[in-house]
A protein has these predicted regions:
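PLP-dependent amino-acid enzyme catalytic core
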Residues: 1-333
């Protein structure tokens, strides 16, 4: 384990090439619930986020928790500024990057992260380089180009786009790829804080999460553990469930085979663009959380995704992308 105390310069990997996690000195301390009620964004939880003076925000977070049945809720992240939960992570990552003097940022994306990064970097005055797969629908490229003139296309998957980025990257570009810096997880963890608050400071029994790179699952689990350690909630921790498609399911395969880490998923192909992550950097971290929480990893038949997504959207009026079909399919199984 390595410890880094200097947050005044950009933080990426550890020296051994592994993701870093933000830790706070809260052990043994019972804190009163500290939420800024005046904030209707994720920054209402500023007391449990890294200390910064100048926040880069577009109004992300504090999204609806919609009840579908007496014991079933869905978190509607489509109402975030650029239409996805990626805005949570980007608000934190870009805020910290700006505070640390970063002038240019780069990342590969399957779609939504690139759109979000470009928007937040424009707000911060940071140049943003986004690498997308050539197969991405044109509307994602256009939405990214709305806020960044530096958009590149390469390969069929986010892994291919990442390889192209490595070839083109120059030394002063700060890489905010999934888990290559620690603060996107801090933004995503606010999902967990919001869910607990919206349930009246209680935990759900189970959280089903559509899992590509996994920062949302990692972030929510981090939030639940923090909340319990501070004494804000005394319920048992939730079971975490990773939902994937049969078109790309490295986490499910590794979980079923009791592996410590994921293997690269060859020839990945799914209409759920955010799940087309054949080699998740945080694979071992995700698997640890699933086992610690007594959770599971399950995949839904790729051929059913379109129909499941349509059914979900008709029921909720959320207009979810196809990742929503994966979660809806698992919710029908009664995990």
């Amino acid at each position: 384990r390595q410890i880094y105390n200097n947050t005044k310069k950009p933080i990426t990997f550890s020296d051994i090439g592994k993701p870093l996690e933000v830790r706070y000195n809260w052990e043994g301390v019972k804190k009163d619930i500290d939420v800024d009620e005046s904030q209707k964004t994720l920054w209402r939880y500023r007391s449990v986020l890294p200390k910064v003076n100048n926040i880069i925000s577009l109004g992300e977070g504090y999204t609806p928790l919609q009840q579908l049945a007496p014991d079933l809720y869905v978190k509607n992240e489509t109402v975030n500024p650029t239409g996805s939960f990626k805005d949570r992570g980007m608000s934190l990552a870009v805020t910290l990057a700006k505070a640390q003097g970063v002038e240019e940022i780069c990342l590969p994306s399957a779609g939504n992260a690139g759109i979000s990064a470009a928007a937040y970097c424009k707000e911060a005055g940071i140049k943003c380089h986004v690498f997308l797969p050539e197969t991405i629908p044109s509307e994602y490229k256009k939405a990214t180009e709305k806020n960044s003139k530096n958009v590149y296309l390469s390969g069929k998957t986010i892994s291919d786009a990442g390889k192209a980025m490595i070839k083109k990257k120059v030394n002063d570009w700060f890489d905010i790829s999934t888990l290559k810096e620690p603060f996107r997880v801090e933004g995503k963890k606010t999902l967990g804080y919001e869910i607990a608050e919206q349930l009246g400071w209680r935990f759900p029994d189970v959280v089903v999460y559509e899992t590509g790179g996994g920062t949302g699952l990692i972030g929510m689990w981090k939030a639940f553990v923090e909340i319990k350690s501070m004494g804000w909630v005394n319920d048992p921790l939730p079971r975490m469930v990773a939902a994937q498609s049969t078109g790309c399911a490295p986490v499910v395969k590794a979980f079923q085979e009791r592996q410590r880490d994921t293997d690269f998923w060859e020839n990945s192909d799914t209409v759920a663009l955010g799940l087309n992550v054949p080699g998740p950097l945080g694979g071992a971290w995700i698997l640890d959380i699933l086992r610690e929480s007594k959770g599971i990893a399950i995949m839904i038949d790729e051929q059913r995704l379109k129909a499941l997504t349509e059914e979900f959207n008709n029921l909720t009026s959320i207009n979810s992308s196809d990742e929503g079909g994966v979660v809806w399919g698992l919710s029908l199984i009664h995990i």
